[in-house]
Amino acid sequence: MPLRLKIILVMSCLWTALSCAADNYDANPSAQVVIDELVVEEGFDREQLIAIFAQAERKDSILNAIARPAEKTKPWYEYRAIFLNDKREDQGVEFFNRYRMELDRAEREFGVPAEIIVAIIGVETSYGRVAGSYRVIDALSTLAFDYPPRSPFFTSELKNVLILSRDQGIDPMSLMGSYAGAMGYGQFMPSSYRNYAIDFDNDDIVDIWNNPVDAIGSVANYFKQHGWRTGEIVVSAATAAKSTPEAIFVKNRKDLHPTRTVAQFAAEGVVAEIKLDPEALATAMKFEQKEGYEYWLGLHNFYVITRYNHSAMYAMCVYQLSQALAARVAR
């Protein structure tokens, strides 16, 4: 073999090795901090953690995806069409009928309507059909160590997935999920799994990945723990006067918490189309249509839905899908 070709091949191999090494995290300084903390605080074996991070890979596709979430890049009428369509409704009715007994039990035990539970699972994963194609360890490592805007959050979730994997006897490299590290039918983050996931079929296993019954109970428990109020109105369509100031409408996640009363919104020109308690706290929302806007007042239970995903458009899709399913399923 000519010397020149040998040199090219050797350099190519070295470059490939260096590139692969750069895409792993075992030598990453931030990963070393996580390793140290897990060893000291949680009793992990250092060598096992080093081996895990040596296999964890940086994924640029994850960084690209989190920079362009649909709820931030699409107007309401396009975003809504992703989740409110005949296919998703048909699949939801099928799921509802298949697990009717378990859904009824969840509604009785947790006070959360069955249609809300099904709608969450439908919006999140098309009822388990699309639960994510990324290794969770890759997603959370990439976002913890290479996405500074939310590094603290994803670092915490990375620790949580390693803890739950150890505690549940699961290989952390086997867990699959979304680009953000969400897992299973209901797309629970690792901390949500540890805090809210439950064994709802009494088989002594908490399996939100393959067991829709556990997923049903876990979603219901999540909502109960976040303050769902049984029987209360979730949201009302509204009208808005031309004089209504733009500042009162939800613009970002910090605006989702209800701080004004229905009466105060009415005084500003945003009036509910159904009768509401004038003293109830609400949020006003303005969603873009192809022509013009539609207006809504979200109440306490609407806010609870946004605890699952901090987006008004997301919560509205969940609510509207739930109502479409309830209208089609005989109870």
List PLM regions with ranges.
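Bacterial N-terminal signal peptides
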Residues: 6-17
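Substrate-binding/active-site groove segments that recognize
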Residues: 136-146, 183-198, 219
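Acidic helix-start/capping segments at beta-turn-to-alpha-helix junctions
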Residues: 49-70, 121-125, 135-138, 237-245
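Secretory-pathway/luminal and periplasmic proteins that interact with or process carbohydrate-rich
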Residues: 58-65, 125-135, 146-151, 167-173, ...
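An acidic, Gly/Ser/Thr/Pro-rich helix-cap/linker signature
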Residues: 23-107
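Short, functionally critical alpha-helical segments immediately adjacent to catalytic or ligand/cofactor-binding
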Residues: 50-58, 113-128, 161-162, 219-220
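C-terminal soluble interaction/assembly domains
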Residues: 241-331
